Curated annotation (Swiss-Prot):
Function: Non-catalytic component of the proteasome, a multicatalytic proteinase complex which is characterized by its ability to cleave peptides with Arg, Phe, Tyr, Leu, and Glu adjacent to the leaving group at neutral or slightly basic pH. The proteasome has an ATP-dependent proteolytic activity.
Gene Ontology BP annotations: proteolysis involved in protein catabolic process
Subcellular location field: Cytoplasm; Nucleus
Main location: cytoplasm
Gene Ontology CC: one annotated term: proteasome core complex
Family: Belongs to the peptidase T1B family.
Cross-referenced Pfam families: Proteasome (PF00227)
Protein name listed in UniProt: Proteasome subunit beta type-1-B
Subunit structure: The 26S proteasome consists of a 20S proteasome core and two 19S regulatory subunits. The 20S proteasome core is composed of 28 subunits that are arranged in four stacked rings, resulting in a barrel-shaped structure. The two end rings are each formed by seven alpha subunits, and the two central rings are each formed by seven beta subunits. The catalytic chamber with the active sites is on the inside of the barrel.
Keywords: Cytoplasm, Nucleus, Proteasome
Amino acid sequence: MISAQACGANGKMKDYHYSGPVEHKFSPYAFNGGTVLAVAGEDFALVASDTRLSEGYSIHSRDSPKCYKLTDTTVIGCSGFHGDCLTLTKIIEARLKMYKHSNNKSMTSGAIAAMLSTILYGRRFFPYYVYNIIGGLDEEGRGAVYSFDPVGSYQRDTYKAGGSASAMLQPLLDNQIGFKNMENVEQVPLSQEKAVQLVKDVFISAAERDVYTGDALKICIITKEGIREEIVPLRKD
């Protein structure tokens, strides 16, 4: 029998319109903005990031640096989804503790980069939404920068920018450090003082144009003596 609910007032069947399949979407990722940058010199390396944590037009935190100290000679900068940044850095720190207990020494910057590549590649079907840059000293005491994509491909660079303002910072670094497509220019070694000032200048410029970058700049200066930090205020609007 046909129920009364399926019939109209005149006793005829109601017309039903099929609108097509409905796709229920679930996104496990969010983009929390922020910018990271690393520069390598002859005997030093810099890793810098802003401290703004945002989503869309909302600022969740004004004091959330994206630089994480791994060893006495290695710092990692992470930008992207903040939850994945925290999870990934905790995994790296646990691996470093296991390595130190087993080998009675700290892992080198190059070994950390290789380990991170395997961690990211192992999650390639559900990747961490994180852009990573490692800065530190290599076995010979020279500055080294390693940049990654979200699924583990990496390379060693002299300088690299990542995050929401990377498209603004990378051309400036190409010009001021890499001397790309410049003729009759003397390429002098980059001093630590000039590198720090350059990092401050490019972040101040980026904060003027990128709404996801701002509040403050944290610079980690890595030398054989250890890691020194500097905080520089940026615009807060």
